[in-house]
Every structure is written in structure tokens, then in C-alpha cells.
């Protein structure tokens, strides 16, 4: 499984996920200046926190 890893809306960078981390995720939030994006691989979908504007979890290569 590969997941995108860059903190931009358009993302070309991917990484192979370690064994057991078969979920790609993307979190978005605003830091009062711009929209921030975090992407990567996880074993379990992270929790949506109050400051997040969106949370995506998926199980296909580069789906985040």
C-alpha cells in the first residue's frame, strides 16, 4: 500500500506504508493563516478533532 505524504492540496509524493498500516488518511484544518493538510499511513483511522475541518480515511493506493 502507498499513501500520499505531502502537506499540499496537489500531492505527488507517496511512501510505502509499513506492515499493518493499511489505511491512508488526510486531515485538514485552518491555522488562521492558511489551510493545513496532514497525510500518511496508519493502522486505525484517526479521530476527528474539534479543530479539523475534514478527515478522510481510505484503503486504496494514494487515495488520500
Curated annotation (Swiss-Prot):
Disulfide bridges in this chain: 3-24, 6-11, 17-41, 45-57, 58-63
A matching Pfam family: Toxin_cobra-type
Subcellular location: Secreted
Role of this protein: Produces peripheral paralysis by blocking neuromuscular transmission at the postsynaptic site. Binds to the muscular nicotinic acetylcholine receptor (nAChR).
Molecular function per GO: acetylcholine receptor inhibitor activity; ion channel regulator activity; toxin activity
Superkingdom of the source species: Eukaryota
Main location, first listed in the record: secreted
Gene3D superfamilies: CD59
Gene Ontology, cellular component aspect: extracellular region
SUPFAM superfamilies per record: Snake toxin-like
Record CDD domains: TFP_snake_toxin (cd00206)
Tissues where the protein occurs: Expressed by the venom gland.
Native organism: Micrurus frontalis
Recorded family membership: Belongs to the three-finger toxin family. Ancestral subfamily.
Alphabetized InterPro entries for the sequence: Snake_3FTx, Snake_toxin-like_sf, Snake_toxin_con_site, Toxin_cobra-type
Name used for this protein in its record: Frontoxin IV
Keyword entries, A-Z: Acetylcholine receptor inhibiting toxin, Disulfide bond, Ion channel impairing toxin, Neurotoxin, Postsynaptic neurotoxin, Secreted, Toxin
